[in-house]
Every structure is written in C-alpha cells, then in structure tokens.
C-alpha cells in the first residue's frame, strides 16, 4: 500500500515523495483507486484560495482563475499537458500511429491551446460561483480524479505498450469505474465516457495524456454542473 500511495501522490501532485520501490499491476491498481484521496491536498489548496479571495473581496472570476492556476501548479500542470496533447492528437490525423506520434512530440498545436483555454475558462468561471462554498469546490477537485477509474477500467485498452498509460490501463474493476461515473455527476461521467470512446476508436486505446485530459474535462463538467444548480 505504501508503494501505491507514493505512486499516486508522486504522479498526480507536485508534492515531494519518495519513489515507489516497486511498480507492478497491483501497485498501479491501488494507486488509481487512491487517486481522489491523493488529490486531497490539491482540493484543500483550491478551497483556501477561494476562501482567501472572498475574504479580501477580489473579483470572483479573478479568484477562479487564481484557483485554477494554483491547482495547475500543484500538479505540475501534468493534466493540462495531457489535455493539450490529446486534443492535438485527435485533430492531427485519422491514422492512429500519426496521432500518437503527434501526442508524444510534446509540442502544443492550435487545437490543443484552444482546448486548454476553453476548459480553463470554464473551470475558473464555475469556481467563481462557488466562493461561498470553498469546501464543496475542494471536494469536487478530489472527485474529479474518479475520472481515472473510468479511463483505467479493465474494459479499456492501452494505446501503447509502454508509458504511464500502459502501466495503469486495465487495472480498475468495472464496478469501481461505474461508481466513479456516478460520483462525477451525470455530466462529468458522460464527458469522460465520450472521451474514452473517442480515443479508443481513434488511437486504439488510452494513454497517460488521455488520463490527464479526462481529469481536466471531468473537473470542468462537474464544476459547471454544480454552478448551474
């Protein structure tokens, strides 16, 4: 369990932790199951930013943007990189090999940049409506990591034989993936399902980038659903 915790925290946050001594399929499965709990420090950070912004009466949208920035910094913007690369891959070609090569190149194209701006804007605008409910916002940040349960479901193949995606793909049991969809809210779960279906058809499976994209899209959709209540 210690290795799984180190794997989850070290992969999903910028917190300094010792690397796991061993990473096998069981460690990867436990790490993905621990993902929402590993994100607890990130959720508390977002809650603190919202509470502080409200206390000093900053403009709500500015506070939302600061919260998104703090969240990105606390996870090394890893999920944002995944979102950008995934959208670039989807926009690049219908050839799976070429799309995967574009994703692996590490450069951001116009499609990826636009997707990042739009999703970040949605997150910030939704967080701006939750200034009086900072703990709820923090909880939603943690729950957004349940998207990884869906992407890493045993029914979803990996697009590559190497990389982070291959390490954690097909590790989460189907009942847990279904629970993850329910915890995300109908909208968040649906968005992740659409992403998974699309990437499996286009790439032949999921990658670490797709997992990052799923987290950011799930957070945006879930925050928006709560903001619309």
From Swiss-Prot:
It is a multi-pass membrane protein. The lineage of its organism: Bacteria, Bacillati, Actinomycetota, Actinomycetes, Propionibacteriales. It is an enzyme of class 2 (transferase). This is Adenosylcobinamide-GDP ribazoletransferase. The keyword Protein biosynthesis does not apply. The keyword NADP does not apply. GO terms for molecular function: adenosylcobinamide-GDP ribazoletransferase activity; cobalamin 5'-phosphate synthase activity. Its cofactor is Mg(2+). It holds the Pfam family CobS. Its EC number is 2.7.8.26. The chain crosses the membrane at residues 31-51, 55-75, 111-131, 134-154, 176-196, 208-228. GO terms for cellular component: plasma membrane. Pathway: Cofactor biosynthesis; adenosylcobalamin biosynthesis; adenosylcobalamin from cob(II)yrinate a,c-diamide: step 7/7. Belongs to the CobS family. One of its GO terms (biological process) is cobalamin biosynthetic process. Joins adenosylcobinamide-GDP and alpha-ribazole to generate adenosylcobalamin (Ado-cobalamin). Also synthesizes adenosylcobalamin 5'-phosphate from adenosylcobinamide-GDP and alpha-ribazole 5'-phosphate. It catalyses: alpha-ribazole + adenosylcob(III)inamide-GDP = adenosylcob(III)alamin + GMP + H(+); alpha-ribazole 5'-phosphate + adenosylcob(III)inamide-GDP = adenosylcob(III)alamin 5'-phosphate + GMP + H(+). It comes from the Bacteria. Keywords: Cell membrane, Cobalamin biosynthesis, Magnesium, Membrane, Transferase, Transmembrane, Transmembrane helix. It is found in: Cell membrane.
């Amino acid at each position: 369990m210690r290795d799984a915790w180190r794997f989850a925290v070290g992969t999903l946050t910028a917190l300094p932790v010792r690397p796991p001594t061993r990473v096998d399929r069981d460690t990867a499965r436990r790490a993905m199951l621990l993902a929402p709990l590993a994100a607890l420090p990130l959720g508390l950070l977002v809650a603190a930013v919202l509470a502080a912004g409200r206390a000093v009466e900053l403009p709500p949208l500015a506070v939302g943007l600061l919260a998104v920035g703090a969240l990105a910094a606390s996870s090394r913007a890893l999920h944002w990189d995944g979102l950008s690369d995934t959208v670039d891959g989807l926009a690049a070609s219908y050839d799976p090999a070429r799309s995967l090569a574009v994703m692996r190149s590490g450069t951001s194209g116009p499609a990826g940049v636009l997707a990042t701006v739009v999703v970040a804007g949605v997150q910030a605008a939704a967080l701006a409506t939750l200034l009086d409910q900072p703990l709820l916002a923090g909880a939603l940040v943690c729950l957004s990591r349940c998207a990884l349960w869906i992407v890493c479901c045993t029914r979803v193949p990996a697009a590559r034989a190497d990389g982070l995606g291959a390490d954690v793909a097909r590790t989460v049991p189907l009942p847990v993936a279904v629970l993850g969809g329910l915890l995300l809210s109908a909208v968040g779960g649906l968005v992740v399902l659409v992403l998974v279906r699309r990437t499996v058809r286009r790439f032949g499976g999921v990658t670490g980038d797709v997992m990052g994209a799923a987290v950011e899209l799930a957070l945006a959709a879930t925050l928006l659903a709560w903001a619309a209540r």
